[in-house]
């Protein structure tokens, strides 16, 4: 809805604490009327569900300090990265829905992901930490670099360089993209690159709700964990896909960032 006010977004579930409200109402503060303003104390919380209930972090203790929140979040991301480094597959809650995440350089992980998705041969999109990492796998022009770095963060089809990875060499092009929000950046700081593909069965809608994701997690033992948060997803939005032809961007799938 318009205007883009907090009460019309999923942030309505997170009342501002006094510290955030002071900044929100201060005409001279850079966060004045920033509708998504929040902190560790009053904003969405990172949560983690695994096959081992003893390792779950599905609740946030009350009264935690900012440093304690940061330590807890780091522990969650470390645990998720450890699973990915060992060839596992996790579900990850992104802005517009859940993704399934795996290491594209690990044949076992890719094989497991194909079984989960019932997707025998179609290549997966790969998220890279930064442009330098993309350049180590693909050829990328200035126009392509500008598009892939834009705020819309589309998946961009790039011609790949030769690589030892069968997954990245599966097609002439790699569907490449960059992280678009903090949790993705922090996960890729721990392991990169990573396959990010929609959490669904082929030809089914992308999962956006915890109930559906947990149901899939319980039914499919090949998914090792669910990394999620307490912010509701109101509108499902998959990543947009584009390609640059004759130095002109061409949309293949118009969705997040463009729709």
Question: What is each stretch, according to the model?
Answer:
Residues 1-259:
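Active-site-adjacent structural elements in enzyme catalytic cores
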């Amino acid at each position: 809805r318009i205007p883009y006010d907090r009460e019309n977004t999923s942030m309505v579930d997170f009342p501002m604490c006094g510290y955030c409200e002071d900044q929100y109402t201060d005409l001279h503060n850079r966060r004045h009327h920033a509708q998504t303003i929040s902190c560790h104390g009053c904003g969405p919380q990172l949560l983690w569900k695994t096959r081992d209930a003893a390792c779950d972090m599905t609740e946030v203790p009350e009264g935690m300090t900012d440093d304690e929140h940061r330590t807890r979040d780091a522990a969650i991301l470390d645990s998720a990265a450890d699973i990915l480094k060992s060839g596992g597959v996790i579900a990850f809650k992104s802005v517009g829905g859940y993704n399934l995440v795996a290491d594209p350089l690990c044949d076992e992980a890719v094989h497991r992901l194909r079984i989960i998705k019932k997707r025998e041969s179609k290549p997966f999109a790969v998220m890279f930490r930064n442009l330098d990492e993309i350049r180590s796998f693909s050829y990328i022009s200035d126009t392509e670099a500008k598009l892939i770095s834009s705020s819309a963060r589309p998946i961009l089809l790039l011609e790949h360089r030769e690589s030892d990875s069968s997954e990245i060499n599966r097609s002439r092009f790699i569907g490449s993209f960059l992280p678009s929000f903090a949790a993705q950046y922090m996960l890729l700081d721990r392991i990169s690159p990573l396959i990010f593909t929609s959490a669904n069965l082929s030809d089914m809608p992308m999962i956006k709700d915890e109930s559906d994701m947990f149901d899939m997690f319980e039914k499919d033992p090949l998914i090792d964990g669910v990394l999620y948060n307490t912010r509701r997803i109101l509108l499902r939005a998959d990543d947009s896909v584009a390609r640059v032809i004759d130095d002109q961007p061409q949309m293949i799938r118009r969705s997040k960032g463009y729709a």
